[in-house]
């Protein structure tokens, strides 16, 4: 019997490579047919239960919300597989899962460095390195950044160690409520898995302490960390790139940490967090751009706001500034 890959983003493509390597037959479905390889564009697959029930396995991408297509009972009668569940069964490394609303990418990046200082590790998952593309890696540790979307699809929790950086409202549009978002996040500590709940934002210290616990016979005195790209990264003297920021709590942290008083550039969909108001304190100007700019202008509270259709328009306007204010890009 054939299998189906449901969703053709980065994870969907890793499913494709995985199934090809096993010489298994499969179809691919995505709401956007233009993304699919040519042979799969020709197939007319409607995501109804009658069409899906005949597939042996359905490899489900994290961002797919099956409830938009099927009832809960219908979903329960399908054989769903996530990339995490496959990796748990097919790789024998020590698996560290890291999740949280903010800081998970930073901590995964730093913990990978700390463990490579004393042993061998690779950062995988939501950090941009799909787990299924790394089934053959030989490192002792897999440091896996996982989103609420991925945890929502995970059937069995087989992490050896779980870490939660923090939980604040986010992705409410996908999960429906903050409570359901929290429940998805907390799946990472289900089944009596040892879990670390982080306190504060000193992720270099947290990463070092975790590495010391795992590799107690190693010294970390000479460890020098490199920082995660696009996370409060300064360049050209006045620009600060915080484009890894994806929610309002991350923005608040950046403004607080920097004690920022320059120009803030922001964009995004406020419905993602069900936001009704964003108070911006510190910057002397706020530039808002993108397709959701009108929605953001309504809820951002600041005395000096300008909105633009595109980032290019923002950059053109910045050329007219007569001062040397720092510019924070935190979309």
Task: Kindly label every feature range from the protein language model.
Residues 83-127:
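Walker A (P-loop) phosphate-binding motif
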């Amino acid at each position: 019997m054939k299998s189906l890959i449901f969703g053709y983003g980065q994870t969907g493509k890793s499913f494709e490579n995985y199934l090809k390597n096993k010489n298994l037959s499969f179809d691919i479905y995505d709401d956007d047919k233009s993304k699919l390889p040519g042979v799969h564009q020709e197939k007319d697959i409607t995501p109804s239960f009658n069409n899906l029930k005949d597939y042996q396995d359905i490899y489900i991408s994290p961002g797919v919300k099956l409830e938009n297509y099927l009832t809960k009972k219908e979903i329960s009668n399908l054989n769903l597989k996530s990339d995490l569940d496959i990796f748990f069964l097919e790789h024998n490394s020590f698996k560290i899962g890291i999740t949280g609303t903010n800081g998970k990418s930073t901590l995964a990046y730093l913990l990978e460095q700390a463990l490579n200082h004393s042993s061998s590790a690779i950062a995988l998952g939501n950090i941009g390195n799909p787990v299924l593309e790394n089934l053959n890696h030989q490192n002792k540790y897999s440091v896996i950044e996982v989103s609420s979307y991925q945890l929502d699809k995970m059937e069995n929790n087989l992490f050896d160690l779980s870490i939660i950086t923090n939980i604040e409202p986010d992705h409410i549009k996908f999960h429906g409520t903050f409570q359901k978002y929290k429940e998805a996040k907390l799946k990472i500590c289900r089944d009596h898995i040892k879990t670390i709940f982080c306190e504060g934002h000193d992720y270099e210290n947290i990463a070092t302490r975790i590495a010391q616990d795992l590799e107690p016979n190693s010294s970390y005195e000479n460890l020098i960390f490199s920082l995660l790209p696009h996370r409060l990264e300064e360049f050209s003297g006045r620009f600060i790139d915080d484009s890894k920021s994806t929610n309002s709590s991350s923005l608040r942290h950046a403004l607080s940490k920097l004690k920022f008083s320059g120009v803030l550039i922001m964009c995004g969909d406020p419905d993602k967090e069900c936001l009704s108001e964003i108070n911006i304190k510190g910057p002397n100007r706020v530039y808002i751009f993108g397709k959701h700019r009108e929605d953001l202008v309504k809820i951002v509270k600041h005395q000096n706001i300008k909105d633009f259709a595109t980032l290019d328009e923002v950059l053109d306007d910045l050329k007219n500034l007569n001062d040397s204010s720092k510019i924070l890009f935190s979309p």
